[in-house]
Each structure stands twice: as structure tokens, then as C-alpha cells.
């Protein structure tokens, strides 16, 4: 075996750099167009395959995750199971793209049941927002069956929140309300000033306040007496177990409080009784500040908007408005592809229906004789007629029993409808069609 003499710098500049960029572009960072990390895209692709023929049927999450390898995902089904469980829950998503059936966790207890016991299917949310799938770009890796990215009409990367860490880069995008993102996309489409979308956490009843580019996520409480209060919401980073172990138990162990659990199906709840060792000011503002601090009711988060762009390259944004503007410009090109394709489709459908209707009339009138001729003879005859030459196989393949006046009339009406549809697509534009897409989002 021949050994190559290489220094450390060469290895770092080549293999290490290649691996670092692989983790950035193919594992940890979401795509700005469809909002998916690769594993999520594979899960959706597998769920879409299973939905063919019956969109309503639920499938075991283990079955969905187990099939991603056949689509070109080679990093193990455990990560696909975890991704699927997160995509289907409602407590962590403003806009779930999978419907879940079974125990997918909650804000109080976040862990989902084992994937063999829970079921999922593609959500109506996906079908309502992801359009033009037939025009989605093919992935450069031939073994990668899903497209390079799907084509939602709003930047779904902003809806549910996403985080990821790769070599040298990290992303942390907060969840935003669907309605505010939709509004911002429409403003960008119309060339208006774009309003920053509202940060909104799913199933959170507290308050989210922006302060100097950061966001404070504030829990809530209310005093039920001078020495007792009821905590009704806690910051989003906590589940029940973590909040109890990090906040309530230490305060109780210090002799400051006693507490009772009042969590239930409607969310968090903790009944707190202050002991005399815990002093509270008579000043309302000071008392509130102490409660918020001591009971961990303030969480601070900031955004780090690092994504993969439509060219498959890393891109960092200073704010979500710039991302939305770029998203709209990219997405408009695919709406134009839809329009161009519809023009061709309807033109072809019109000409075929018209040719069939005309052909039937000629057969009925006796100007074209079908009976007694071989397929080859009829093909040669029709090929010489310009109107029929592009559709010879379809005309020759028509059932002779369907060549009636009623069928000719029906085809003429179909041709008229396709002609009108063709005229519509010729006169519409990207802004009109994109606006219609947005209006369909409820």
C-alpha cells in the first residue's frame, strides 16, 4: 500500500471542509423554500407515497420511517421516527404537516409514544400550501428520490420554528403565526412594505414581547390571596418535569414555598403557597419583577436565520422580512412555470377534442370511411390531413361505437371549454395566480 505524505492543513482544507459543508447543506440546516431539513423531506415523501389512492388512511410511524431508505435516506430510521413524531404533534407546531393518531406528547409531557404505536398521514395543511410539486427541482443526487425542495406558497420555514447545529454554523428560527406570514408574503408579492410577521408559539397562553431584537417569552400567574398564587403558564422551554425540578423543587427545598400540581388537559397549572421566609414587597412592580425572576417565568430568545437557499447553498439573513422577499421572488418563477405549462396543456387538449369531434362528423357523413380498412391504411390516410396528423394514434384508437352525433357534440363542448381555459391562462399573470393561491389558505 502506498502512503501519501500530507500535512494537517491539507486534510483540514479538503476532507474536513467537505464533511463540514455536508453537515451544513445536507443534514442540519433547513431549506428556505420548503422549510425542511433533509430527513423531514424524506418523511414527507414517504408519507406521500403511502397516501396514493387513499389520503385519509393513517400509517404506523414506524412504517413511514422504515421506508425512507428506499428513497435514498441512509442515516437510519431512528432519526426519521423522531422527525415524524415532531412533524405530527400539535403542541410544537403552528402548522403541522402530518396528522397524528395516538400519543404524540404534549407541552406538559413532550415525549411521544414509540413509533410502532402511533400513526400519521399527510395533513391537509400540506396539500393546501404545497403546490406545483410536478415542477419541483430534481435533486442532484440520483439516489435522492424526493425533489431538492418542495414548493409551498408561503415560507413554511418560519411557521413552526426550527433549530440546527452544524460545523461552524447554527440556525434558530422562531415560530411565526400563519396569518402574519401569509400577509407578509402578499405584501411582498404586491410590492408593498412588508410587515414583520408575528412570533407565535403553539399552545402558548403567555405573552411574547420583542425587546431590542430579542424576544421575551413570559409565563403568567395570578394571586389568589396574599400568600398564595396560581401559575397558569410557564415559558416555552419547560415541560412539567423540567420546570418542577429546576424551579419549584429548589424553592420548596429552601423553605420558601409549598406547591401543588394543577396541570391538566388545558395546560400548565401550579398552586403555590408562600412561606413566611419568602419576602414579597408591598410595591406591585417590585413584587411582580421578583415573582417573574424567582419562578423562572421569563425566557429570552433571539433568532439566527441560517438556511439553505434555492441553489443549495448556505445563506444567512439578518431578518425574516428579507427572507420573505427572496422567497417570493423564487416562488414566482414556479408560478410562471405553472402558467406556461397550463397554456400548453389546454392548447393540446383543445386541439385533440376538436380533432376528435371533427373526425366523428366526417365518419358519420361518410367523408371518411373507417370500416373495411386496416389500422395501417387508416393511419396513412389520417396522417395526410393536417388537422389529424398530430393525433393519429388517438383517432385510430377510438371505439367505433362511440362515433355518434352525441359524442361529437360532447367533444365540441369539451373543445370549447378547453379553448376558454386556454384563453384564461394566456391572459392571467403571476401575481393574479399567486394571490389566488394565498387566498385559499384558511
Swiss-Prot record:
Give the enzyme class: isomerase
Q: Might you give the EC number(s) for this enzyme?
A: 5.6.2.2
Q: Which cofactor does it need?
A: Mg(2+)
* Pfam families, per database record: DNA_topoisoIV
Which residues belong to any copy of the Topo IIA-type catalytic domain? 29-438
Q: Which residues form a coiled coil?
A: none
Q: What is this protein called?
A: DNA topoisomerase medium subunit
Species name:
Enterobacteria phage T4 (Bacteriophage T4)
Q: Which gene encodes it?
A: 52
Amino acid at each position: 500500500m502506498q502512503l501519501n505524505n500530507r500535512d494537517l492543513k491539507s486534510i483540514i482544507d479538503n476532507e474536513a471542509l467537505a464533511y463540514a459543508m455536508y453537515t451544513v447543506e445536507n443534514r442540519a440546516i433547513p431549506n428556505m423554500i420548503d422549510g425542511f431539513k433533509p430527513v423531514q423531506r424524506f418523511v414527507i415523501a414517504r408519507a406521500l407515497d403511502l397516501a396514493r389512492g387513499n389520503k385519509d388512511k393513517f400509517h404506523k410511524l414506524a412504517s413511514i420511517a422504515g421506508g425512507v431508505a428506499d428513497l435514498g435516506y441512509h442515516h437510519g430510521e431512528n432519526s426519521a421516527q423522531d422527525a415524524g413524531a415532531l412533524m405530527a404533534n400539535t403542541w410544537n407546531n403552528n402548522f403541522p404537516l402530518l396528522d397524528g393518531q395516538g400519543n404524540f406528547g404534549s407541552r406538559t409531557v413532550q415525549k411521544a409514544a414509540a413509533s410502532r404505536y402511533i400513526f400519521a398521514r399527510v395533513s391537509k395543511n400540506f396539500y393546501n400550501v404545497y403546490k406545483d410539486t410536478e415542477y419541483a427541482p430534481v435533486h442532484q443526487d440520483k439516489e435522492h428520490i424526493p425533489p431538492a425542495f418542495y414548493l409551498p406558497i408561503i415560507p413554511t420555514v418560519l411557521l413552526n420554528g426550527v433549530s440546527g447545529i452544524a460545523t461552524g454554523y447554527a440556525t434558530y428560527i422562531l415560530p411565526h403565526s400563519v396569518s402574519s406570514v401569509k400577509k407578509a408574503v402578499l405584501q411582498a408579492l404586491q410590492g408593498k412594505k412588508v410587515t414583520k410577521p408575528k412570533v407565535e408559539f403553539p399552545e402558548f397562553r403567555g405573552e411574547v414581547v420583542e425587546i431590542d431584537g430579542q424576544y421575551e417569552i413570559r409565563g403568567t400567574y395570578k394571586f389568589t390571596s396574599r400568600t398564595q398564587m396560581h401559575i397558569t403558564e410557564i415559558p416555552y422551554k419547560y415541560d412539567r418535569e423540567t420546570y418542577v425540578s429546576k424551579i419549584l423543587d429548589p424553592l420548596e427545598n429552601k423553605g420558601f414555598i409549598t406547591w401543588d400540581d394543577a396541570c391538566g388537559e388545558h395546560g400548565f397549572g401550579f398552586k403555590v403557597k408562600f412561606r413566611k421566609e419568602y419576602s414579597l414587597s408591598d410595591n406591585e412592580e417590585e413584587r411582580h419583577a421578583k415573582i417573574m425572576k424567582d419562578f423562572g417565568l421569563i425566557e429570552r430568545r433571539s433568532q439566527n436565520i441560517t438556511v439553505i437557499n434555492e441553489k443549495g447553498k448556505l445563506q444567512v439573513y439578518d431578518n425574516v422580512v428579507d427572507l420573505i422577499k427572496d422567497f417570493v421572488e423564487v416562488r414566482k418563477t414556479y408560478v410562471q412555470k405553472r402558467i406556461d405549462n397550463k397554456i400548453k396543456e389546454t392548447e393540446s387538449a383543445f386541439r385533440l377534442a376538436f380533432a376528435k369531434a371533427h373526425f366523428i362528423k366526417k365518419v358519420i357523413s361518410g367523408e371518411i370511411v373507417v370500416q373495411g380498412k386496416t389500422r395501417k391504411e387508416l393511419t396513412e390516410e389520417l396522417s395526410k390531413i393536417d388537422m389529424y396528423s398530430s393525433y393519429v394514434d388517438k383517432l385510430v384508437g377510438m371505439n367505433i361505437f362511440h362515433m355518434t352525433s352525441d359524442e361529437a357534440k360532447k367533444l365540441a363542448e369539451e373543445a370549447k371549454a378547453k379553448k376558454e381555459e386556454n384563453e384564461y391562462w394566456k391572459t392571467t399573470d403571476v401575481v393574479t395566480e399567486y394571490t389566488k393561491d394565498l387566498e385559499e389558505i384558511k
